[in-house]
A protein has these predicted regions:
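Residue(s) in the substrate-gating loop at a strand-loop-helix junction
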Residues: 142
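Short C-terminal tail/terminal secondary-structure segment
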Residues: 2-6, 147, 226, 237-250
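Active-site helix of classical SDR
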Residues: 119, 158, 166
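Conserved glycine-rich cofactor-binding loop
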Residues: 21-22
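Short, small/polar-rich loop/turn modules that mediate ligand/substrate recognition or access, typified
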Residues: 174, 179, 236-238
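Substrate-binding pocket helix/loop in short-chain dehydrogenase/reductase
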Residues: 95-108, 206
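Active-site loop-to-helix junction immediately N-terminal to the catalytic Tyr of the SDR YXXXK motif
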Residues: 99, 148-156, 168
Length: 250
């Protein structure tokens, strides 16, 4: 599916998309690649060849977001960076119950601490960027940043934290020429939501509340990320943009 009729030119722009090997992250990485950016991605498998899709167009780094040393190594390996997309995330880690304190803690470590560590590790390279409109960090929030989803209390707490982290990084790093924003997807087709798709009891309450009445796709989310990273958004920072088919206003 064509992501949008709006064309962005990111020629020469260096982009890192964490979790860019699948789902929303893969859609974002593809969109930057089509816009002529130099795109690196992370994934949990040892190499790009371990995936069932062709990732040869990207620089690939194996990374788990709970590994602080690996986060630093990935950041240090980059020659330069203009845009960081903190997309990597996981709910119900390993299929376990997030109401168990250890699992809750792991979910927060993956979805909040990992994004903060990666942002901090990349700060100096982003501050050195000459990208028109300034360097950007785009965080992935969620509807669970704002609404209760009782099955994933750790994930929801982490994603709520992402919204506030976005504001604080934006305020603190604006003098360094770094803009920090977030997008908050609604119900989007991905590996994370695969078990819900087509199961009426699970998806119907969300679709009934979504005015646009359908699942979103990674191609719905990617254009919002490219906009926030572009010079068209040069005076926008600290904001979280819902990309949810109207779920948050219904």
């Amino acid at each position: 599916m064509d992501s949008a009729k709006v064309a962005y030119d990111f020629s020469g722009c260096r982009v890192l998309v964490t979790g860019g090997s699948s789902g929303i992250g893969a859609g974002i990485a593809r969109a930057f690649l089509r816009a002529e950016a130099d795109v690196a991605i992370t994934g949990t498998r040892p190499s790009a060849s371990d995936y069932d899709r062709d990732l040869s167009a990207y620089g690939y780094h194996q990374l788990r977001m709970t590994d602080a040393d690996a986060i630093r190594r990935v950041a240090d390996s980059l020659e330069g960076l203009d845009v960081l997309v903190n997309n990597a995330g996981e709910n119900l880690p390993g299929g376990r119950n997030e109401w168990e304190p250890d699992v809750f803690e792991e979910s927060v470590a993956i979805n909040l601490f990992g994004a903060f560590r990666m942002s901090a590790a990349c700060k100096q390279k982003l501050a050195a960027s000459a990208l028109e409109g300034g360097a950007s960090i785009i965080n992935l929030a969620s509807m669970s940043s704002f609404f209760a989803v009782p099955i994933v209390p750790g994930y929801g707490a982490a994603k709520a934290g992402v919204v506030q982290m976005t504001k604080n990084l934006a305020a603190a790093w604006a003098p360094d020429g770094i803009r920090v924003n977030a997008v908050a997807p609604g119900l989007v087709e991905s590996n994370m939501t695969a078990l819900m798709q087509g199961v009426e009891a699970l998806e119907k309450p969300y679709l009934d509340r979504t005015p646009m009445g359908r699942w979103g796709t990674p191609e719905d989310v990617a254009p919002a990320v490219l906009f926030l990273a572009s010079s068209a958004a040069r005076f926008i920072t600290g904001q979280t943009l819902p990309v949810d088919g109207g779920y948050s206003v219904a």
